[in-house]
Curated annotation (Swiss-Prot):
GO (cellular component) term, any one: cytosol
UniProt pathway annotation: Alkaloid biosynthesis; morphine biosynthesis
SUPFAM superfamilies: NAD(P)-linked oxidoreductase
Temperature dependence: Optimum temperature is 28 degrees Celsius for reduction (forward reaction) and 30 degrees Celsius for reduction (reverse reaction).
Biotechnology: In yeast (Saccharomyces cerevisiae) engineered to produce opiate alkaloids, the expression of COR proteins leads to the accumulation of neopine and neomorphine as major products.
Effect of deleting the gene: Plants silenced for all codeinone reductase proteins accumulate the precursor alkaloid (S)-reticuline at the expense of morphine, codeine, oripavine and thebaine.
Region: Disordered, residue numbers: 299-321
Tissue: Latex secreting cells (laticifer cells). Expressed constitutively in all organs with highest levels in capsules. Restricted to the parietal region of sieve elements adjacent or proximal to laticifers in roots, stems, leaves and carpels.
Protein name: NADPH-dependent codeinone reductase 1-2
Catalytic residue list: Y56 (proton donor), H119 (proton donor)
Natural source organism: Papaver somniferum (Opium poppy)
GO MF term (any one): codeinone reductase (NADPH) activity
InterPro entries: AKR (IPR020471), AKR4A/B (IPR044497), Aldo/ket_reductase_CS (IPR018170), NADP_OxRdtase_dom (IPR023210), NADP_OxRdtase_dom_sf (IPR036812)
Compartments it resides in: Cytoplasm, Cytosol
Length: 321
């Protein structure tokens, strides 16, 4: 366990990752001094795992915060941090994977990543990030060649490990059929209102660590939901345990054997989020949470197309499998 109280998880490749990380998606302060200071503050209060992506447009501010943290002595070495970034869909082509990773490294001012993930199981026509993706730009991903390029990134030392995000069991099976280096992580939505039981069991059987996003319902994001934070079941457990609803939700995820990333720019909540490892939910608590109605918050609508690989949410998530 780290000095900040966050347990370390050993991934199937042997590298160690903090069980809790700070997410950097959908900030209202993109590219601002406030965003950089929030990341710097997170390092100061004890966060050592940061989750970013090319699509989040937060890499540069995070890189500046890391550089400043080193200058201030908040950390002695970049090696104290675990940095995850993600390959955007427009770069999910065999010849663009390595250049995309190298661009992320330039943004972050780092020599290597700890973990590089394929952001979504779909490709787009090459090009810059756009607010609205034209439907005719959505393409099927060649898992074999794209994953081989991800493997090359690891072999060359630009990332210590590779994984995926938003992959279903079916899509993981297809990718792993030709993989030489298996994915160590699958980052997906998971919370008391989306248990992901089948996917968790599949990933556990294949030594893939689930990292949960949207643990609190992604409140504030366009696709967000209040279902977690307004849950009467979670509220009752929180009162009984002397914890917040957020802490109960996060603790539930951790007790399922998953790691997690959460986002807050509020210092008090940053500190609160770190304090989920000092007590356990009881078997009775877990049973109550198992009965919470299930629904998905994340939407893949922006990656659906009548002419693309996935025409419906059900096809994208393989929810009818």
């Amino acid at each position: 366990m780290e000095s900040n109280g966050v347990p370390m998880i050993t991934l199937s490749s042997g590298i160690r990752m903090p069980a809790l990380g700070m997410g950097t998606v959908e900030t209202m302060e993109k590219g601002t001094e406030r965003e950089k200071l929030a990341f710097l503050n997170a390092i100061e209060v004890g966060y050592r795992h940061f989750d970013t992506a090319a699509a989040y447009q937060s890499e540069e501010c995070l890189g500046e915060a890391i550089a400043e943290a080193l200058q201030l002595g908040l950390i002695k070495s970049r090696d104290e941090l675990f940095i995850t970034s993600k390959l955007w869909c427009a770069d999910a082509h065999a010849d663009l994977v390595l250049p995309a990773l190298q661009n992320s490294l330039r943004n972050l001012k780092l020599e290597y990543l700890d973990l590089y993930l394929i952001h979504h199981p779909v490709s787009l026509k090459p090009g810059k990030l756009v607010n609205e993706i034209p439907k005719d730009h959505i393409l099927p991903m060649d898992y074999k060649s794209v994953w081989a390029a991800m493997e090359e990134c690891q072999t060359l030392g630009f990332t210590r490990a590779i994984g995926v995000s938003n992959f279903s069991c079916k899509k993981l099976q297809e990718l792993m059929a030709t993989a030489k280096i298996p994915p160590v992580v699958n980052q997906v939505e998971m919370s008391p209102t989306l248990h992901q039981k089948n996917l968790r069991e599949y990933c556990k059987a294949n030594n893939i660590m689930i990292t949960a996003h949207s643990v609190l319902g992604a409140i504030g994001a366009p696709w967000g939901s209040n279902a977690v934070m307004d849950s009467k079941v979670l509220h009752q457990i929180a009162v009984a345990r002397g914890k917040s609803v957020a802490q109960v939700s996060m603790r539930w995820v951790y007790q399922q054997g998953a790691s997690l990333v959460v986002k807050s720019f509020n210092e008090a909540r940053m500190k609160e989020n770190l304090k989920i490892f000092d007590s356990e939910l009881t078997a009775e608590d877990m049973e109550k949470i198992s009965e919470i109605p299930q629904s998905r918050t994340s939407s893949a609508d922006f990656l659906l197309s009548p002419t693309g690989p996935f025409k419906t949410e059900e096809e994208f998530w393989d929810e009818k499998d």
